[in-house]
Each structure stands twice: as structure tokens, then as C-alpha cells.
Amino acid sequence: MGPPRFALLFLIVAGLTALVLPTTAHGDLFISNFNSTLIFTDRLNLYRAVADQPTAVFPTGLSGAPYGPLFYYPTAAWLWALDALHVIDAQGWAGTNDESLRSLPAILALKLPNLAVYLAAAVVVAKTLGGERGRFAAELWLANPAVILFTLMMGQNDGWTALASVAALYFGLRALERDSGGPTLGALAMLCLAAGAAIKLSPIFLVPVFAWLIGKSYREKLLLAAVGAGAFLLVISPFLSTTYFWDYGLFGQQAGKATDLPSWAAALLYAGYLSLVVAAGRREGDRGQALLWSFVGFHALFFLLGGWSPQRSVLFIAALAVAVPARRWYLVAYVLVTGFALLAALEHRAELAAGLFEPLTARALLIPPLVTSSRPEPAHTLLFGLSGIAWLAALALAWRAPGTDGRRLPIAPLLLIAALPVYLAIASVKLPSGIDAMPYQTPARAQALAAGDRFSFYFISPQDELRSITFWVEPGGGRAAVSVRDDGGRTLAAEPARELVAGANEISLPRTERAAGHGFTVAIAPAAALSVRMVTPPPELALASAELNGVPVPGTAAFSAHYETTWDGLFGDALTRLRSAWRTLVVSLALCVAGFAGCYALVRNEGPATGG
């Protein structure tokens, strides 16, 4: 891409980023930042602090702190600095729904690390390949609508792991190019992988791969592997005595084992992948090409395992952004994976509804996710299959013909960025218009139950996968019959004489997939008097009803009123909020222009292409 068009792309993306950075957000952004403050307001061990909070485990079984320490502790340091400078009042936040936490100035401040990571990743991607190919790779990263959606709009942290991974690739390729200094650069690659794994686990599986391909002797290979594994263990060692960290921060669905496959099957596939890596390292030719092939191949394996949340696609797109300029065969996989990620976001708990509207209007929060919208499952399955086939085909072709023959497609990044507004418009149209339900604004009080009473509560799940449901019993506890049914009348769990303890009581469920938008009923019939209440829900669960002996409990919904959100109401709220926050938009524009200008200068002046 020539300098004028290259600069135009940066200008367009900078303007778009300045608009969406303070005005869009996902609930995970608020939960992660609120919980990060516990490090300096509660106790230094975050996972012990979170375990005592209502946000520790949601009624759906997912965690309020599902990531590794190298996300939360830098976030806490950033929040502490903002608090010390009186930009935010982090110590005054009452919870994840605090208005000051969800204000547009606060959202902008919270997302600045994501902006820095997004721009830094572009620079690293460019330097990894160098020259015109590096600039093209940076454009494919910066202009990708899925990357912008998940990293800058929703505020997800997968870009952090992507940055660590591509930085490891950069140092690994440099280590292979140099006759001297290789071990030091190789060690830096290992440290980057360890850092990425201490945010989200997947990069740890690249440690033996990089060690094998970078090390020039068996001794050097072992030392490099020890550096990567040792650095990772050193970072997580302070938390290994905390059960909550093992269950959620290390091996939980969100942070670690996301695949639907059994562990033995995933291990077998990984072993097969490692055998290909060993074979690639023994082939004649450029070892840098083998390292790049192995890097892209690992992310293809991760993609094909399935079970990951849509925001994980940022990792795959980063790998493919590096691969496309080197081998044009990867372009089809890049486009299909991007399309699959965007489609998955449409059907994944209405992420677009929350991400697009939540900071600008409260009305969208009153719409339960995906209750009346259709799930494009056939298209989802087809696109996933096509993406996997295209990726594997590109890897096979690259295996047969190692080398570099990437083709420049100057118009591609501009088409990518133009696709984002179109996609957001389509996503907006898919918002449900109404449902026969009315949300409650404050949780119901704890209910005193006598022997023979029947207390039940009903809620709509925001999660596709429901693993457990939690309720609280006031001091005393007791024995009760407990059952869980879905809205089709099927009994998912039934315990005729469960011993309830004071505090949280978690009901484990058989794996319940595609639960989003469906209702579930929990019924409790005590053998003796006790007091029980629902867990205080996060905003997306603030739609539920409770009954005592068949009579609705005050403070909950009876699911009888029809609620409808109008488009003029949504846009009216948004325009009012934007007008009142114009200063925040000006600050956002200034910061984005400065950040993109620095990124442009670094990427534009990138030297000639490397041989990797």
C-alpha cells in the first residue's frame, strides 16, 4: 500500500476508534476492572479476594476472575495510577453497576491499555516480517473488524495474549537469523510466551515448539524450554495455594480448557502437531519458515478444537495477519475466520447488543439476550467448516512449498474497515424488540420458609453453556428437596434431601449447551424452617421471577407484562449521552490521533523484509 493510502487507512481507523473507545463496552470490562481493584483495596492475592465476592462465580457457573495474574495486576496498577491522579474514583466503586464506573470518561480511561496493546501489536506484526510485507500485516491487524469489535469496543483482553504471542514470534525469528545473540533473543521469545500464558493459557503450548526450533543444540533446546516453563511457573506460583485460581484462573473454561473435546483427544491432537513440528525442524531450508508454519499451525489446531468464546478469534487473526503477507494461500482462511468470529458474536449471548448500546442507553439492558432473535446455526457450522478447511489447505500448501510469495492487496484493509459499520448495522437490526417479561430493579429479600413451603425462582440464562446455579441460605442451613427444570419441563437435577449450608449453595448441572435465552426454574422445599434468597445477579441476569407457594414474591417479575424498546428511544438516549460527553470524545480523538500517529511512524519506516 502506497504512503497516501496507508496514511488514509490510519486516519479512518483512528477516527472510528476515537468514537467507539469511550462509547461502547461489554460487561466483562466492568467486572474485570472492578475485581482488579480488590488487589489494592482488599488483599494482594486477587484470587483469594475475588473468591469472597458475589462476583466470584455467577449463577451460570462462570467466573468473575477467569484470567491469569498478568492481566489483573497490570490492570490494578493502571487503576491505582488513575485513582491517584483523580481521573477515576476506583476505591469508591460500589460494584460493577456503579454509575461512575460505567461513565464514558471512565470507560475511555479503562480502555487505554487495550488501545496501547492494539497499536503495539501492529508495530510488532510489522517488524516481524519487515518491509512492505510487514506493513501489509499491520494493516490486516489494524483494519480487522473482529479485532476492533472485541479489543476496542467490548474491551476484551485477548489482544494482550495476541501481543505476547506475536512478540515471541518476532524474537524467535530474529534468534534464528543471527549467528550471535541467538540464545538471548530465544530466551526473550520464551519469556513472551510465558507472559501470554499468564494471561490466557494457550501460549504455554508453544514453549516446546519454539524451544525445539530455535535451539541449535539439545542443551540449548532444554534451556529455552526451562526458561519458558520456569518463567510461567514463577508468575503463577504465589497463587497455586488458592483453589479458586486452579478452578477458574488456570484451568477454567474461560482461561484455559475451552475445548469441547475430552482431554485425551486434545492431548492426542497436540502430540500429532508436535510430531509435525519435529519433522518441520529437520527439513532442509529456512528454519524461520518452519517456525512461522508451526506458529500458524498451532493456532489452526486451537481453532479446530472449538468450544472457545468468539473473542478468542483475536489470537487466530493475529497469527493469520502475519501469515497472509508471507503466503497468499492464508488469505482465504483469514477472511473466513474473521467472518466466523463476527457471526459467532451475533449468536453468543447478544454480545453486540451489550457492546453497542450499554454505555449509551439503559434500555438495551432490559432486553434479555437472544430470546426473540434467531440463531444462525447452519451458517455458523458451515462457516466454521469452511474456515478449518481453508486453514488446513493453506498449511498443507505451505508445507509442500516453503518460501515467500505473498501478494499485496492494497484495497483489502480499506474493505475490511468498511465492513465494520455494515456489520454493526446488521447486528443492531437483530436486537430483540420485546418479550413477555418485566425486569425487577432490586433483588427480592430473603424468604423465610417453613417446613412444607415451596420456594422457586425462574431466570433466563445469558450463557450458552449452563454448568451450575447458585443460591444463598441465611445462617442456620438445613435439609431441603431441591430440583432444577428447564423451560421445556425437563428435570436437570433433583436431590430429595440435600443438606443446605449457610452461604452459597451451588447446584451442579449436567452439561447444558445452547442455554442462552432459555428459562430455568429452581425449586426448594425445606424439611424445616430456613431462609433462602437468590444470588444478587449481574445486569444481564436482572430479569427473573420468584414465587412462594405459587404466589409471586414482591420485587420480582411475574413474566406477564410486554416490554418493547423503540429505535427512537435508543438513538435518543445515545445522542443525549454523546452531547453531554463531548469533552470525552475530544479527549478520545486527541489520544487516538497521537497513538495512531506514533504507530504510523514506526510501521511506515520499517526496514526491508526479513527472510522469515
Where are these regions (language model features)?
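Primarily membrane-embedded glycan-assembly and transfer machineries that use lipid-linked glycans
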Residues: 3-169, 173-178, 211-298, 345-391, ...
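Hydrophobic/aromatic-rich transmembrane helices and adjacent perimembrane loops
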Residues: 164, 205, 309-327, 382-391, ...
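Membrane-interfacial entry segments at the cytosolic side of transmembrane helices
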Residues: 216-228, 328-333, 403-416
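Beta-sheet-rich sandwich/jelly-roll-like modules and their strand-loop junctions
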Residues: 404-417, 421-488, 499-506, 510-517, ...
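Juxtamembrane interface at the cytosolic side of transmembrane helices
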Residues: 593-612
